A protein has these predicted regions:
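Mg2+-dependent endonuclease catalytic cores in nucleic-acid-processing enzymes, primarily RNase H-like
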Residues: 99-238
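A short acidic Gly-Thr/Ser loop motif
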Residues: 80-86
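Glycine-rich phosphate-binding/hydrolytic loop that grips phosphoryl groups
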Residues: 243
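ATPase catalytic-site recognition across NTP-hydrolyzing enzymes
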Residues: 2-79
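Short beta-strand scaffold segments in enzyme catalytic cores
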Residues: 87-93
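Solvent-exposed strand-loop boundary residues in beta-sheet-rich modules
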Residues: 95-97
Length: 243
């Protein structure tokens, strides 16, 4: 039982409206696991201004791409895959100067590439423009040199179903022959991407309903600091990404 079960509505209202800080209200009253303080996050500038909640009807998770309000049906999709002890797959599109992350798909063991691809294929089956520009963790290129071409495997799993029949999708691997991005550079880039006003990069918006795992990962990724001589280097502590 959490405190919300035993407190009166008036007490809850007062606690929410100023008696407690929001993170303390979530932890003490609702029994929610608290997030990180903003000042120790790797994605320091990510906030409510980067989220939207009207991406699907009634604020409920979409069960098909036809329920995504901001999906451009006649345009290709961008996808980003992270290869780790779980597979994470986010899908987005850019319209004008706004980039929207529309959907988050993931797969945990024993599921793997086939299962992840099947989730994507089911959800985006009605999408008219069956082109996917796939970006991935550059470490995927390292796997390829070791004879485990993860990027090629997910491409093949999307372009052909479990019976080897072509699905109609064309996947373009966008990260071939690209080296890993140092975390210090990623930190600087994300600061630039997420800051408001007067920037050349597009405005970032994430569907907080259909990408809740991504939002959680961003908000719970802590930053660490190490030194190379007198140079301070910010890096991402990846314990929040483990199962």
């Amino acid at each position: 039982m959490v405190n919300v079960d035993i407190l009166t509505p008036d007490t809850l209202f007062n606690l929410y409206n100023g008696t407690l800080e929001f993170h303390e209200f979530c932890k003490s009253v609702l029994g929610m696991r608290p997030g990180l303080r903003k000042d120790i996050r790797f994605y320091l500038l990510f906030g409510e201004q980067h989220k939207y909640y009207d991406g699907s009807p009634d604020g409920l998770p979409a069960d098909s791409c036809t329920r995504l309000k901001y999906l451009q049906d006649d345009q290709p999709l961008d996808g980003g895959v992270d290869f780790g002890n779980m597979l994470s797959f986010v899908i987005g599109q850019q319209r004008g100067n706004t980039y929207r992350v529309l959907k988050n798909i993931y797969e945990i063991p024993p599921g793997w590439f086939r299962e992840l691809a099947d989730r994507f294929l089911r959800f985006f089956a009605p999408h008219s423009c069956k082109e996917l520009n796939l970006y991935y963790d550059r470490a995927g290129n390292n796997f390829a040199r070791q004879g485990e071409d993860y990027a090629r495997k997910i491409k093949d799993a999307i372009e052909k179903d479990a019976d080897g029949v072509r699905t109609g999708w064309t996947v373009c691997l966008m990260s071939r022959r690209q080296s890993n991005i140092p975390q210090a550079e990623e930190y600087g880039f994300m600061q630039e991407l997420m800051k408001e006003g007067g920037k050349k990069l597009p405005r970032l918006l994430v569907d907080a309903v259909n990408c809740k795992e991504l939002v959680s990962s961003i908000e719970k990724a802590p930053a660490g600091i190490r030194y190379s001589g007198t140079e301070k280097i910010v890096f991402k502590v990846k314990k929040s990404e483990k199962l």
